[in-house]
């Protein structure tokens, strides 16, 4: 079995689904944003504000290469922009959690939105969301309809890997 890699826009449910998949499949769960945050000693928002997005993307790219060297399969929850890296291919079986922008914003309360620097301006966030759709689809081994909630997404992933 390869790594199971969850991609999609911020707030699509990647972190929650990763935890459920890890439990169901008895696999360790890794979260790329959390790993970067712990290593740098700053939250993702603080990294963006203090070090800039370019540095954050460099940390992401390096982490992808590092994760490729792991010998055992993991469930990997990724940041929303990870699809901008060419080295994502080959990391594992990739599941795109597809959701519409309106549902995504409804799911995220104000506190959650404040943690996500790219959601500061909803007009710009929607433009980014639309721009990334093609990248998510291009990088996906499978597309998961994430509008139906966590249990529905879990069932879809488990069916694809059965």
Curated annotation (Swiss-Prot):
<keyword id="KW-0418">Kinase</keyword>
<keyword id="KW-0808">Transferase</keyword>
<keyword id="KW-0057">Aromatic amino acid biosynthesis</keyword>
<comment type="function">
    <text>Catalyzes the specific phosphorylation of the 3-hydroxyl group of shikimic acid using ATP as a cosubstrate.</text>
</comment>
<keyword id="KW-0028">Amino-acid biosynthesis</keyword>
<dbReference type="GO" id="GO:0000287">
    <property type="term" value="F:magnesium ion binding"/>
</dbReference>
<dbReference type="GO" id="GO:0004765">
    <property type="term" value="F:shikimate kinase activity"/>
</dbReference>
<dbReference type="GO" id="GO:0005829">
    <property type="term" value="C:cytosol"/>
</dbReference>
<keyword id="KW-0963">Cytoplasm</keyword>
<dbReference type="GO" id="GO:0009423">
    <property type="term" value="P:chorismate biosynthetic process"/>
</dbReference>
<feature type="binding site">
    <location>
        <begin position="11"/>
        <end position="16"/>
    </location>
    <ligand>
        <name>ATP</name>
    </ligand>
</feature>
<keyword id="KW-0479">Metal-binding</keyword>
<dbReference type="Pfam" id="PF01202">
    <property type="entry name" value="SKI"/>
</dbReference>
<dbReference type="InterPro" id="IPR023000">
    <property type="entry name" value="Shikimate_kinase_CS"/>
</dbReference>
<dbReference type="InterPro" id="IPR000623">
    <property type="entry name" value="Shikimate_kinase/TSH1"/>
</dbReference>
<comment type="similarity">
    <text>Belongs to the shikimate kinase family.</text>
</comment>
<feature type="binding site">
    <location>
        <position position="15"/>
    </location>
    <ligand>
        <name>Mg(2+)</name>
    </ligand>
</feature>
<feature type="binding site">
    <location>
        <position position="132"/>
    </location>
    <ligand>
        <name>substrate</name>
    </ligand>
</feature>
<feature type="binding site">
    <location>
        <position position="80"/>
    </location>
    <ligand>
        <name>substrate</name>
    </ligand>
</feature>
<feature type="binding site">
    <location>
        <position position="57"/>
    </location>
    <ligand>
        <name>substrate</name>
    </ligand>
</feature>
<keyword id="KW-0547">Nucleotide-binding</keyword>
<dbReference type="GO" id="GO:0009073">
    <property type="term" value="P:aromatic amino acid family biosynthetic process"/>
</dbReference>
<dbReference type="InterPro" id="IPR027417">
    <property type="entry name" value="P-loop_NTPase"/>
</dbReference>
<comment type="pathway">
    <text>Metabolic intermediate biosynthesis; chorismate biosynthesis; chorismate from D-erythrose 4-phosphate and phosphoenolpyruvate: step 5/7.</text>
</comment>
<dbReference type="InterPro" id="IPR031322">
    <property type="entry name" value="Shikimate/glucono_kinase"/>
</dbReference>
<feature type="binding site">
    <location>
        <position position="116"/>
    </location>
    <ligand>
        <name>ATP</name>
    </ligand>
</feature>
<keyword id="KW-0067">ATP-binding</keyword>
<protein>
    <recommendedName>
        <fullName>Shikimate kinase</fullName>
        <ecNumber>2.7.1.71</ecNumber>
    </recommendedName>
</protein>
<dbReference type="GO" id="GO:0008652">
    <property type="term" value="P:amino acid biosynthetic process"/>
</dbReference>
<dbReference type="GO" id="GO:0005524">
    <property type="term" value="F:ATP binding"/>
</dbReference>
<feature type="binding site">
    <location>
        <position position="33"/>
    </location>
    <ligand>
        <name>substrate</name>
    </ligand>
</feature>
<keyword id="KW-0460">Magnesium</keyword>
<comment type="subunit">
    <text>Monomer.</text>
</comment>
């Amino acid at each position: 079995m390869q790594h199971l890699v969850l991609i999609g826009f911020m707030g699509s449910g990647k972190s929650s689904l990763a935890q459920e998949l890890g439990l169901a499949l008895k696999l360790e769960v890794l979260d790329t944003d959390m790993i970067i945050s712990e290593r740098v000693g700053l939250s993702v928002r603080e990294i963006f504000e203090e070090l800039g997005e370019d540095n954050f993307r460099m940390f992401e790219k390096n982490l992808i290469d590092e994760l490729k060297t792991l010998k055992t399969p993991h469930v990997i929850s990724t940041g929303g922009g990870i699809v901008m890296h060419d080295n994502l291919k080959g990391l594992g079986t990739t599941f795109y959690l597809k959701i519409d922008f309106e549902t995504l914003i409804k799911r995220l309360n104000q506190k959650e939105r404040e943690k996500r620097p790219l959601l500061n301006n909803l007009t710009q966030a929607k433009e980014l969301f639309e721009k990334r759709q093609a990248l998510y689809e291009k990088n996906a081994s499978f597309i998961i309809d994430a509008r139906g909630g966590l249990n529905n997404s879990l069932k879809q992933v488990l069916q694809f890997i059965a």
